[in-house]
Design a protein with these regions (language model features):
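Exported/extracytosolic protein signature
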Residues: 1-171
Length: 171
């Protein structure tokens, strides 16, 4: 009742917002070295895994097959990140292709599902190699260079050097 003893009527409606549980994961792979890498160069990769959902993730597996990285993170809370590093040494096969692409994959159990559903992501990083240079150098020297007469024996030494950056065959 109001101060004059009149009945007062009204309604109060409550709004309830339900947040639906959702699992999400993100992986980012980076490197500082991106161009003109040579055979034997070591590329250091940083792999950052982040829980972008609104539930804690468990059994998080991070795989980078090229670098033989296989890590497991037991639990990754909402909004949290884990950072891993791994390395790869450039091989001649990479030089022959002109670049090397490396992929990081991540998966985790999806706690919002009753089955074996996983949340997954992957990211890659490509580095370019120096230009392939197939080159050979041949040097020929004699053990005697002057004062020769007909019938003298001369011994030659031939040195063949691969001064390129790829293996040569059938030389």
């Amino acid at each position: 009742k109001d101060p004059k003893n009149n009945n007062v009527h009204g309604e109060d409606k409550e709004t309830v917002t339900t947040i639906v549980a959702g699992a999400g994961i993100d992986v980012l792979k980076t490197t500082e070295t991106k161009e003109n890498v040579k055979v034997g160069d070591t590329i250091i990769y940083t792999i950052t895994v982040k829980n972008i959902g609104n539930v804690t993730l468990t059994n998080v597996k991070v795989d980078d097959d090229e670098t033989n990285l296989h890590e497991e993170i037991a639990e990754l809370a909402v909004g949290k990140t884990e950072t891993l590093t791994t390395e790869y040494t450039i091989k001649e096969a990479d030089l022959l292709k002109g670049s090397f692409t490396n992929i990081a994959k991540v998966e985790a159990d999806d706690p919002t599902k009753d089955d074996d559903t996983k949340v997954t992501d992957q990211d890659d990083e490509t580095v370019t190699t120096e230009e392939m240079n197939a080159h050979i150098k041949v040097e020929k020297t004699a053990d005697v260079t002057s004062g020769l007469e007909v019938g003298d024996e001369v011994t030659y030494t031939i040195v063949v050097t691969n001064d390129g950056n790829v293996t040569l065959y059938n030389v």
